[in-house]
From Swiss-Prot:
Pfam families per the UniProt record, alphabetical: GreA_GreB, GreA_GreB_N
Organism, as annotated: Verminephrobacter eiseniae (strain EF01-2)
Signal peptide positions (record): none
Keywords, ordered alphabetically: DNA-binding, Transcription, Transcription regulation
InterPro entries xrefs: GreA/GreB_C_sf, TF_GreA/GreB_CS, Tscrpt_elong_fac_GreA, Tscrpt_elong_fac_GreA/B, Tscrpt_elong_fac_GreA/B_C, Tscrpt_elong_fac_GreA/B_fam, Tscrpt_elong_fac_GreA/B_N, Tscrpt_elong_fac_GreA/B_N_sf
Entry-linked PROSITE patterns: GREAB_1
Job description of the protein: Necessary for efficient RNA polymerase transcription elongation past template-encoded arresting sites. The arresting sites in DNA have the property of trapping a certain fraction of elongating RNA polymerases that pass through, resulting in locked ternary complexes. Cleavage of the nascent transcript by cleavage factors such as GreA or GreB allows the resumption of elongation from the new 3'terminus. GreA releases sequences of 2 to 3 nucleotides.
Protein name in the entry: Transcription elongation factor GreA
Biological process annotations from GO: DNA-templated transcription elongation; regulation of DNA-templated transcription elongation
PANTHER family named in the record: TRANSCRIPTION ELONGATION FACTOR GREA (PTHR30437:SF4)
HAMAP family documented for this protein: GreA_GreB (MF_00105)
Amino acid sequence: MTTIPITKRGAEKLKQELHHLKTVERPSVITAIAEARAQGDLSENADYDAAKDRQGFVEGRIQEIEGKLSVAQVIDPGEVDGGGKVVFGATVQLEDEESGDTVTYQIVGEDEADLKQGLINISSPIARALIGKEEGDTAEVQAPSGIRRYEVVAVSYR
């Protein structure tokens, strides 16, 4: 079975969502189904149909999270010794060689990615181009507008 990398923060976030789904959402859906059943005829009961749809979503998400957590390899970026190289969990400061703009990204797992917060998916084109690079190296990324070149300015593990 293949493991999937996830940061300690990402694993905690998934565990919190799972707890919420099991302790709040699931009981709420069960109550909604019971209330809809009490209305009588289920063949044309929109409340019942909506509650059953919601139950399907909640149960599906619970299974999805449990599956991901069962194969997750939890990595604490603060404990990573990448030897100065860009690895999973590393925070990387980059300079666009064309524009001179600087950006900072942390390389995280699929469920944690949020570009607005500077969190990029390990399987994204830019993360794949950065893995193994060191400060001073240049990474080339295929973008819709053509190849972009970024210099690795700093690498940290936090």
